[in-house]
Amino acid sequence: MAELTLDVARKILDAALAKAVEKKIKPLVITVLDARGAVKVTAAQDGTSLMRAEIAHGKAYGALALGMGSRALFQRAQEQAYFVSAVNTLAQGRLVPVPGGVLIQDGGKLLGAVGVSGDTSDNDEICAIAGIEAAGLKANPG
């Protein structure tokens, strides 16, 4: 696949939402970015709390900006807080270095990232991975 299409982004979104329903977790916001960082799709389930859209976007944006899933970014923040703080300053505070931001890959090609927020970071990540894999792509959570 040369780039992440809107149709594929919708498949990722729909499958991630289906996983959330299956797991009976708290309402989620899911954002899918392409490799340029452009929003392909975003959706909020009914009942999401304030700031969830910004958090979901920040998880995907951080993963994409640094080329690592947000779980790895979280670990990097714990080990080298000064580095993540500096990068987040450059990114005008848009990085959210906690699990739930997952890179979308096809073979070795980076297509974009998914960010999920609303439940625990681990559950957010599970839904992101499910969406990506349902679209026949490789999920890289870090």
Question: Language-model features: where?
Answer:
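Flexible, solvent-exposed loop/hinge segments and secondary-structure transition points
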Residues: 1-142
